[in-house]
Curated annotation (Swiss-Prot):
Keywords: Glycoprotein, Lyase, Membrane, Transmembrane, Transmembrane helix. It comes from Tolypocladium album. This is Terpene cyclase terB. The chain crosses the membrane at residues 19-39, 48-68, 75-95, 114-134, 137-157, 169-189, 198-218. Disruption phenotype: The disruption of the whole terpendoles biosynthesis cluster abolishes the terpendoles production. Pathway: Secondary metabolite biosynthesis.
Amino acid sequence: MDGFTDSQAPPAYEEVKWLADTLVAFMGIGWLINYGAMIRHSYQGRTYCMGIIPLCNNIGWELVYTLVHPSSNRVELAVFAAGVTLNVIIMFAATRSAKTEWQHSPLVANHTPLIFLGGTFVCFAGHVALAAEIGPALAYSWGAVICQLVLSIGGVCQLLQRNTTRGTSVTLWLSRFLGSCCTVGFAFLRWRYWPEAFAWLAGPLVLWSLATFVLADITYGVCLYLISQTETSSTKRSKLK
C-alpha cells in the first residue's frame, strides 16, 4: 500500500481526511517556523542550532522524498520542498559559524563544508537504500522516525554539552515539538481509520520510538528552562556587583 496516496482509502478514513491534511499542514507550519527561527538564531548568535548529524540526516531524507520518491500529496510535497530549501540555508549558516563554534577543534572548523556535504550524501544514500529495501512508503515513515530520534536525542546532548541557551529558545523547542506531535496525530488517524494499511503503526518498535521522542523532547524543555534560570540568576548577580 502506497503511504503517500489516499486514492484507495476506506470510507472511514475519507471522513477524517480533512483533519489528516490539516495536521500535515500544521506539521509543516511548525517546522517552517522552527527552520526560520534557526536561521535567525544562527546569524544573530554566530552559532548553529541543530547538530551536524541530525541536520545532514534531515536534508538527506527530505531530498529523497522531494526528488527521488516525491509524495503525491501536494501539501506534503510543498512542505518537503520548503523544508529542504530552508535546511540548506541552515547548513550554510552553520558552515559560516563553524570557526566560532569549533575553535577547540580546528580539524572540524576548517573542514565544515566537506563534513556537511559528505554527511548529507551518506544520509541521502542511506535513505535511498532503505526505500529500495522495504519500499518507499514504509521507508518514508521509518526514515522520519530515524530523523526524529536522532534530532531529539542529539538536541538534548547538544544542549547539555553547551550548557547555554545560545542557539536555542522556547520558540525553537515548541515549534519542533508541536510540529512533530501533529505528525503523530496524522499517523494516529491512519492507524485508527485505515488499519488495513497502517495497523503496523501500533507495533512495539513504533510505540517505543514515540515514547523515546516524547521523553527526549520533554527532557529538552526541562533542561532549557533550568539552564535559562541559571543564566538569568548569573546575570542578576553580575549586575549587583
